[in-house]
Amino acid sequence: MPPSNPAMVNGLNGSHANGNGNGHNHISDSGSETSGESSNGSGRRRMKLNRKMSSPMAPPFMVSAPGKVIVFGEHSVVHGKAAIAAAISLRSYLHVTTLSKSKRTVSLRFADIGLVHTWNIEDLPWEAFQQPSKKKSYYSLVTELDPDLVAAIQPHIEVVSPNHPEEIRRVHHSSVSAFLYLFLSLGSPSFPPCLYTLRSTIPIGAGLGSSASVSVCLASALLLQLRTLSGPHPDQPADEARLQVERINRWAFVSEMCIHGNPSGVDNTVATQGKAVVFQRTDYSKPPNVRPLWDFPELPLLLVDTRQAKSTAHEVAKVAKLKQTHPKLVNSILDAMDKVTDAASELIEETSFDNGSVEDLSKVGELMTINHGLLVSLGVSHPRLERVRELVDHEGIGWTKLTGAGGGGCSITLLRPDVPAEKLQKLEERLETENYAKFETTLGGDGIGVLWPAVLKNGTEEDEEGGMEIDLEKFLEAEGTEGVEKLVGVHGDTGEREGWKFWRVESQ
């Protein structure tokens, strides 16, 4: 770790950069332009590296942040009730390479959405961001974007991906606006030239907090480079660890404002601290009340993507119309959902709760089943979601509910701890046959993680002396989400890996 100072992304999957001939879409880890990029079988471009030219001033490092799911209270939360959101073990990974001082460029590459661009550091609008009335400190609390600063970065956003279709350009510009606003707010004209490369295992546009995960990665990477974070280290007290993650969370929220305009702050909070939160918003002119569940246990989860397109706005409007037609009845349903959320948080926060106990997990699972039934009564399920429940119930594997807005999207299944592996495999094969995407994940895991330097020890013969260095070429060549997770994942194939470190926020 660096010494401490004492004082997408919403997007499209599968697109790739086509290059526009402007000299800013082809980058190497030396920060220089390069041609002759080759394409692998998936259509994703690979960089040609020139390691001798890079002369990095600091070792490459990585940060990683999780996605999230709503576990209890979707839809009722829109009507002023409480909900619980928790981290999942699907994550985004950001690789940071510091370049030689002579390069004076900063490059952003989000490989999974085909975004790649390089800016000259001196050409960025530092004058606007460095004004005494505008300049922020790393510990500042920023609750709204400055219109003057937003305007100042627009010319540097507009030059990105000019030859891409408009829909893809919007995605790229959203990501770039978040990065540039953070980079210019926290950095200075003397900031070291760098290459920021992102890969993610979180499905995009599925309500799983992919953009917040990216925002947390960007904020934490910049704060680490500024040496404004303490830790993470094993002996750090929980209250100090929470202070560090809150510092990251504040700037991740700024990034989310760039992407979404008026975010709730829930997604970035979960992605930063991990575990889970209870959140409630009774007044939409004010931020929600967010209460961390610091000791939320890790729970085994099967996440299933129905691959059924859905519209959050449409599903929310359906419930609002139903409430208008049957106010007493729908209010009773919403009140019941609120009681389910309260019961779940009380149960999970009990000191005697055992996440390995079938009895305790059954209680949580029963609450999930009740919550789903109430959502069905509001008309926000879908035959594809009900089919998942049918398959899971038939095999007796766990307890399933929809997560998010419904009408398609994803379901979550809390897995029984005693379910035979062959039974789970049979279910997963059936899901694949019926065109579902499934992810075995963990609910309530760690938040932001740091790998400094970018070296992992897997405890295998493949390890080089001192561990396996994760260089940019390996990172970009990892095939799909499984390849990324196997190469740099917190757990990989062999359980907890030596290298990744987390701020320990638990009370115990």
UniProtKB/Swiss-Prot annotation:
Keywords: ATP-binding, Cytoplasm, Kinase, Lipid biosynthesis, Lipid metabolism, Magnesium, Metal-binding, Nucleotide-binding, Steroid biosynthesis, Steroid metabolism, Sterol biosynthesis, Sterol metabolism, Transferase. The gene is ERG12. This is Mevalonate kinase ERG12. One of its GO terms (cellular component) is cytosol. One of its GO terms (biological process) is isopentenyl diphosphate biosynthetic process, mevalonate pathway. Mg(2+) binds at residues 211, 256. ATP binds at residues 68, 200, 205-211. Pathway: Isoprenoid biosynthesis; isopentenyl diphosphate biosynthesis via mevalonate pathway; isopentenyl diphosphate from (R)-mevalonate: step 1/3. Residues 10-42 have a biased composition (Low complexity).
